[in-house]
């Protein structure tokens, strides 16, 4: 087992990783910026090191500072969490070159899956269903590009190969817009991601966002932990997630599970990962793979009983997967509401001092949060301050428990989006299950389609 893990992150995920390390008897090193001296996990870690000023570019994104902190504390491994450097192949490479273990996939695999064109090619080879589109990058030759778009059929979407999280994409509804849109996206992609390559795909008008959680040991063994539905989104940011995804064609589901597991083995994947799909008319279409732990991993843990973060640590220590596919049984239903420090109407960040914090409780309720009474939420980072997760024997029970949990949650002193969640878990269409990715924006009156 790993001896000492440096947690290269902050907030709720840093606390989540620390708890998993402690359960496995692994010593921990917490790193933090000057703005994060009050973080809960700092006092719980064996050691803590300040790695720079408040801006993430000078602290949590500073690779030399993180590696130096690992060296001075004698850490043997580094867990990146999510966000920041979690999917940065250069970070993974420098960690391994410096003699530490990176808790995650190899740099080569991160690069492969981080480039949307090479990722799509790898998935096609593994038999994972993909969205119809350009075979590789969209050619700069105008006639060829127009011919590809005609064959795919409008509307199409032009995406930056190095993009993600909803950035670097443009929907084109007819031929007259194609060339101009391609040029604009190329220019933006070059500036934002350092890679001007773009590709073209069929634009699915009303899909759902369904993803598959996998674990793979990089030694030829891989399993899936079922799927999640993350269709309730605002500006491509997930708001509520659930497992399993409701109302999915079972044959299509089992087929895509098998393909994802096979893909992990073929690319030599190591650690926890997520295959993200658009799901429309009973069919799955691969969009990207996240090569890290995800914010919404708890819903999969609740319905399978598998501790994903502990499994990541075991795999990183060189152990083979201890869980076989036949051991994974999906029982019941789980929901997760992301609690953000933001104005529920304008969605503007709401940093400040938490005067009083009370976490909900009761049967089947889990709260992953770094908040406590007296803690000050800094203005420098993502607004996520916690996740309320509920589990039930079925979806209705999980929803009933979530309604109770949100009513019990108290966060005084700052604004949060709790009221939005209270509304959503009582929304008739969401309660029925199976809303598409545009539903929330339409409900909020911000629909662009």
Curated annotation (Swiss-Prot):
Source species, domain of life: Bacteria
Binding site residues for hydrogencarbonate: 238, 292, 295, 338
Pathway: Lipid metabolism; malonyl-CoA biosynthesis; malonyl-CoA from acetyl-CoA: step 1/1
Chain positions recorded as biotin binding sites: 338
Binding site for Mg(2+) 1: 276, 288
Cofactor binding mode and count: Binds 2 magnesium or manganese ions per subunit.
Binding positions for ATP per the UniProt entry: 116, 159, 165-166, 201-204, 209, 236, 276, 288
Positions bound to Mn(2+) 2: 288, 290
Cofactor(s) recorded in Swiss-Prot or TrEMBL: Mg(2+); Mn(2+)
Catalysis performed (reactions): N(6)-biotinyl-L-lysyl-[protein] + hydrogencarbonate + ATP = N(6)-carboxybiotinyl-L-lysyl-[protein] + ADP + phosphate + H(+)
Principal EC category: ligase
Record note on quaternary structure: Acetyl-CoA carboxylase is a heterohexamer of biotin carboxyl carrier protein, biotin carboxylase and the two subunits of carboxyl transferase in a 2:2 complex.
Origin species: Pseudomonas aeruginosa (strain ATCC 15692 / DSM 22644 / CIP 104116 / JCM 14847 / LMG 12228 / 1C / PRS 101 / PAO1)
Residues at the active site: 292
Protein name as annotated: Biotin carboxylase
Function of the protein: This protein is a component of the acetyl coenzyme A carboxylase complex; first, biotin carboxylase catalyzes the carboxylation of the carrier protein and then the transcarboxylase transfers the carboxyl group to form malonyl-CoA.
Binding, Mn(2+) 1: 276, 288
GO BP term, pick one: malonyl-CoA biosynthetic process
Biotin carboxylation domain location: 1-445
Keywords: ATP-binding, Biotin, Fatty acid biosynthesis, Fatty acid metabolism, Ligase, Lipid biosynthesis, Lipid metabolism, Magnesium, Manganese, Metal-binding, Nucleotide-binding
InterPro entries: ACC_Biotin_Carboxylase, Acetyl_CoA_COase_biotin_COase, ATP-grasp, ATP_grasp_subdomain_1, BC-like_N, Biotin_carboxylation_dom, Biotin_COase_C, CbamoylP_synth_lsu-like_ATP-bd
Single GO MF descriptor: metal ion binding
Its EC number(s): 6.3.4.14
Domain ATP-grasp stretches: 120-317
Amino acids binding Mg(2+) 2: 288, 290
